[in-house]
A protein has these predicted regions:
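Conserved acetyl-CoA-binding loop-helix of GNAT-fold acetyltransferases
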Residues: 128-137, 263-267, 273-290, 295, ...
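A conserved beta-strand-loop-helix scaffold within acyl/acetyltransferase catalytic domains
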Residues: 220-270
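Conserved GNAT acetyl-CoA-binding A-motif
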Residues: 142-151, 288-299
Length: 332
């Protein structure tokens, strides 16, 4: 099991994997938690759905480790598809593949991980050694620190690299990647909505990245052209004032599926806790579907419980997680 993902506490009702130790012989139970004390887990149906099977009780002395899982079974190809669509939405100023075709290296503003990291998108990336010499040379040329984007499972080789040199890396918080299909959507509501091909100064003035204003160059990269469609959405007060914003992208995954991704969600101070985040999300989902998107994804820091609840209300479920690892300066 991964050492860098899913260390959060589990709760009743959640889907988990529990490893049992029978005198050195290990066995995993995957299912839904019925009780924590005693630990009772009902094995899952195919696909990760709840079942009616008999529950399994795991005594404390047998429990080796327990980890929370995403609500449904996820294939590695599902994870890769979303990360490919995301990479197309955040290409950076320059991007190129390593010579083995397994890692996409991106350099941009030096601020956001999505545009300034190397990510394992090739089908064999999880099984081959990380091509660190190429990655280090790429970021040295751009005068940026080495940063690896590590999606769980398909980033297994990067996890091994970090485990071998834990003191050489700084790990950022876990990020949830949440998804939903666009077949049936919530009603957008009657708040005035507008979407533009490019943001104006009012949109840019409202946007912050993790609570901080972005430098001018980073804002320029945010609106740079991508291999897909981009839209800058906003909600308007009756006076015409911009009161909430978001950036939407339509990009393809490797299998040709069109994905709506939306990010840069911000609600103006004084307008928060009025349901505008939900209304903005509903409008963006409707816009994405009208533009031909079949599914939607977004990313939220795992510790942002309010954000996670908001997106669950919009029909999103956690699919997988990823983290960024930054190489620390080497001491001579």
């Amino acid at each position: 099991m991964s050492r860098i993902f899913r260390s959060d506490d589990v709760s009743v009702g959640e889907r988990v994997v529990a490893r049992r130790d029978f005198d050195g012989v290990y066995s995993d139970v995957i299912g839904h938690v019925l009780s924590l004390d005693p630990l009772l887990i009902r094995p899952q149906e195919v696909g990760g759905y709840p079942s009616s099977l008999d529950a399994v009780e795991i005594p404390p002395e047998q429990l080796k480790i327990i980890k929370r899982l995403s609500p449904r079974t996820v294939r590695n190809s599902d994870i890769r598809a979303i990360e490919v669509a995301t990479a197309a939405a955040f290409p950076g100023k320059e991007h190129t593949w390593t010579s083995d075709g397994q890692w996409l290296m991106r350099a941009g503003d030096g601020v956001t991980g999505r545009s300034n990291s190397a990510i394992p998108l090739g089908p064999s990336a999880g099984f081959l050694p990380v091509p660190m010499e190429e990655i280090e040379a790429f970021y040295a040329r751009h005068e940026l620190p080495v940063c690896l984007a590590i999606p769980e499972r398909i980033g297994a080789s990067a996890e091994k690299l970090l485990a071998a040199e834990p003191e050489a890396w700084e790990l950022e918080p876990e990020i949830l990647v949440m998804v939903r299909d666009l077949a049936e959507l919530p009603a957008p509501g009657d708040v005035s909505f507008r979407i533009d091909e490019q943001p104006d100064s009012e949109w840019l003035d409202l946007y912050h990245f993790r609570g901080q204003a972005l430098p001018p160059l980073a804002l320029e990269y945010l609106r740079s052209r991508i291999d897909g469609t981009m839209g800058f959405g906003r909600l308007l007060a009756p006076t015409g004032e911009t009161i909430a914003i978001t950036r939407g992208t339509l990009t393809e995954s490797g299998d040709g599926t069109v994905w709506l991704g939306y990010s840069a969600v911000e609600v103006a101070e004084g307008w928060r806790r009025k349901g505008l985040g939900t209304a903005l999300g509903a409008h963006m989902l409707a816009w994405g579907k009208a533009q031909g998107a079949e599914k939607a994804y977004l990313q939220v820091v795992a510790g942002n419980t309010a954000g996670v609840r908001l997106y669950e209300m919009l029909g999103f479920l956690e699919q997988h997680r990823h983290r960024y690892a930054r190489r620390l300066p080497q001491v001579p």
